[in-house]
Amino acid sequence: MGIRRLVSVITRPIINKVNSSGQYSRVLATREDQDKASPKYMNNDKIAKKPYTYRLFSILGILSICSLLLISLLKPFNGADAPQCESIYMFPSYARIDGFDERYTPLAHKYHLYLYREQSVDREPLNGDELQLDGIPVLFIPGNAGSFRQCRSIASACSNIYFDSNTRATLRNENVRNLDFFTADFNEDFTAFHGETMLDQAEYLNDAIKYILSLYERTPDYPHPKPQSVIIVGHSMGGIVSRVMLTLKNHVPGSISTILTLSSPHAASPVTFDGDILKLYKNTNEYWRKQLSQNDSFFSKNISLVSITGGILDTTLPADYASVEDLVSLENGFTSFTTTIPDVWTPIDHLAIVWCKQLREVLARLLLESIDASKPEKVKPLNQRLQIARKLLLSGFEDYSWMNSKLNYPQENLQEFSDNFFSDYATLEMNDVLDFEMFNLEKWHNNYTKINIPSNISSTEHLHFTLLTSLDMPMIYFCTESRVNLSCITAVDSILTVPRSSKDTQFAADSSFGEAKNPFKAVSVGKNILQKYDYLMISKPTYGEFSEQEGMEDNQGFLLALLRNVSNVQIVNTTPSQILLFGEQLHLDGKDIEQVISFSNLWDSLLSYKLETKIEASNEGIASEETLFQPFIRQWVYEPFESKWHLNIINKSLDINMHNVAPFIPLNESEPRSLQLSFFIPPGMSLEAKMTINWSLTLKMLFIRYRLALASFPVAFIALVLSYQFYWYNKTSEFPSFDSTLGYILRKHGILMFFTLFLASPVVNNKLVQRILYLLDPVGLNYPFLLSERNMHANFYYLGIRDWFMSTIGILFGVMTVGLLALVSKIFGSLEILVIFLQRKLSKKNTEDKEAFDTIEHKAYGKGRLMASVLLLLLVFFHIPYQMAFVISLVIQIATCIRVALLKLSNNEQKLNLLNYNMTLLLLLLFVSAINIPIIIVFLHNVAIKWETSFRSHHNILAVAPIIFLVGNNSIFKMPNSVPLDTWDGKVTIILFVYLTVFSFIYGIRNLYWIHHLVNIICAWLLFFETIH
């Protein structure tokens, strides 16, 4: 049963009950009856035909919305995407720094500064009235609606590691010192919604840093050179605030050189409700790019920016937004995912990223190993800091991780060995597997195994060495041999930690930090490094080394090594459309320990896949035997540095989702973007796998990336309907209802409209088209061609899609928008009927039907309404944001619609015109209010915390005055008169609504705030139109 029919079945008895008296039947015609209300109307334009197409699209749209909501809420994340954070505890204490008052910052009444101390571990924060500071200053910046207490987890871990002599001994830092964690209390400000709030925080924190450094200057017994800089740790929008700080006039030069951000949206603003936020992003990014482009600037030589994101579990902020690729080069920072970080290996949600046990241990070590108490800067040089960050935050398989590896620089790191050091060795030929196992050690009679690296073959293009072991520290030597001496480098710093994959592990985090099961170790070296050496020496492990491994069952210890000159990379050129139609069959033999499948055409973050794996039929018997390890997969992309680990994959269905090429996110188009799957397979085992599209996960992730479309798409459709309504109104003097007009559009132009929604994505992805769109962009804040010298490019238009295959999303969103608008419209219609019914029940008598209309119709704006409007504008000018006045206008428009519905008219056609006009305008204002409400939330929050300073932004009375006066006109039942279509007045009205439609579709998602201004301009025209006619 269609929605319209369902509403009719519910409401018809009420209408019949009211109409039973007879005398009011001519008065109570509603929009539900408009198909029968005016024969003349039907004969003129036939717009009110039964909209079966509209019903179909409405039902499909509502079903799509429900399905998407159910999938988003109910579908769990599985396997590598499942949350595995462990619980933590700490004993926090906070000392409020009251000395940082109005003498140092004008924002002291609004914000506060605290010093964190871990109870029973740290030094007491106060000695009488004086702060006790003996460490290195770190400033924690909370995010949107964040608390200063969120610093406690990382600060606690830093204190526990440093003040425990055993754990402090494991730090690779001779000049380590305890950390003094300062944290800012912003009273849970909504930073993401309001640019002025972000500026306030940045200004306050610059003053706070200046004050913090002065505290150390006044500390007489500080044991080291006085600090001249502060380490920054920012969560969410706090990371953006930290970047803004360096652009302000009150920034102390050199006071910030190390920034670590957690789930911070560097690449793009997560919301576009406020123009100030977008301008702040633009100005800050341009400042950073300019500074970093100068090789001799402080930024280039000192600033490090490391961004960490929780990946797929961050449903508050799309993980794609955490990329810093367009801001800093790899010499100054990078982006990593928590699924990539060794000993963490789990996705983390937006809030948990500040307290997750596994991650906080790594972050604490990163901070403690990056500092240098002997220097005033209190941090190591830039290249050393990034080397530490790469070691701790990347998997180690990335080429970027090898930048500072000792193996990469043999001339500087080779050590001389005596000729007889490796005297007891056996030689292993290339392509033969070295297989040390706990139960077969006796068959290996030599202490070392030598693997010669070929140098005289015609091509070593595919030369690679792979080692995988359960040992904690395998001994591997990369050696060069000359006539004079033997020189080698131990591969200690190149041994990588990978998750343990066995029958008793399900998730990568099962062998992460603090777990009973030890992870595996691996070495993966390519030709570029191997060609610098003559041979490898691998030490034979002892039985004791195997047996001492925690979580190791009998006979499970192993060490596998293999040198091959055969490519272990299989390139698959299958496209998403081919996977959709046929799937992709994969075959992996057991000839190599690590085999890589590179999907050259799979790079779109919007698509998720499902991978089903099984043992090849020819060797299924292996499944019942004890293998050295269970096959596992490292899923990865080149940049950003995201890796995921899928364990124990036999007979499993794996979810494959990546953060790669994403909507609206800048990327370097010269870098490879292929999805990579590295299979680690025991010798002799062959696997079969099939890849298909995972539609449920794809749809689940759509909502996270396109939440802003919930405002822009409905506004575009409503504006399109209004343009048609005014067209028919000017043509026939009949203003059709929203439902009938949308139904007419779908019936007459639905195929063209949805084809346009599909075709728009590949069209706006064209660079020539983007240049034209940028020239036509009235906002001008989103330049697609960011850094041409680095091939950095972004698609800010429409849905930001770069692949034609996902262009169908436009059609899906179009259908969902029709369903949403139909649902809202029917709710309004039902409320209208209910109001009429209640009015008839409560009213005792009805008089002067026509006279009442005539009196109101000729009524002037009135002094009372004029004074109320002027008073509201004065409030906007002096105190409240104009968004608040907009919502007040929305409430007045709702009241107007109710009053129009209750009118008793002899001329039913006039009432329908007035009702349809006001109802459609109400729909428009309702969805625009979704854009304005976040600013109101910020304003009310400031009122709640009794912040006395006025709301310094959004006091432009011109941004809301036309809306206020138009709604005031509507409240006295005025509406624009119909004019001939061939006049400029009629054309301008239609052109304005068409432009709003196009803008909302093409520019709307990334410029939501501008939609309000366009609606305001249209209201100004309608107000002028009503006045002159």
Swiss-Prot record:
Signal peptide segment: none
Annotated InterPro entries: AB_hydrolase_fold, PGAP1-ab_dom-like, PGAP1/BST1, PGAP1_TMD
Topological type in the membrane: Multi-pass membrane protein
CC terms in the record's Gene Ontology section: endoplasmic reticulum; endoplasmic reticulum membrane
Molecular function as annotated in GO: phosphatidylinositol deacylase activity
Residues modified by glycosylation: 19, 295, 302, 447, 456, 485, 565, 651, 668, 694, 918
Highest taxon above the source species: Eukaryota
Any GO BP annotation: vesicle organization
Active site: 236
Keywords: Endoplasmic reticulum, Glycoprotein, Hydrolase, Membrane, Protein transport, Transmembrane, Transmembrane helix, Transport
PROSITE patterns: LIPASE_SER
EC annotation from Swiss-Prot or TrEMBL: 3.1.-.-
Transmembrane segments: 57-77, 708-728, 749-769, 804-824, 872-892, 920-940, 957-977, 985-1005, 1008-1028
First-level EC class: hydrolase
Protein's cellular compartments: Endoplasmic reticulum membrane
Post-translational modification: Glycosylated.
Primary site of residence: endoplasmic reticulum
Entries under Gene3D superfamilies matching the protein: alpha/beta hydrolase
Protein purpose: Involved in inositol deacylation of GPI-anchored proteins which plays important roles in the quality control and ER-associated degradation of GPI-anchored proteins. Required for the transport of misfolded protein to the Golgi, although dipensable for the transport of many normal proteins.
Family that this chain belongs to: Belongs to the GPI inositol-deacylase family.
The protein's name: GPI inositol-deacylase
Organism, scientific name: Saccharomyces cerevisiae (strain ATCC 204508 / S288c)
Gene: BST1
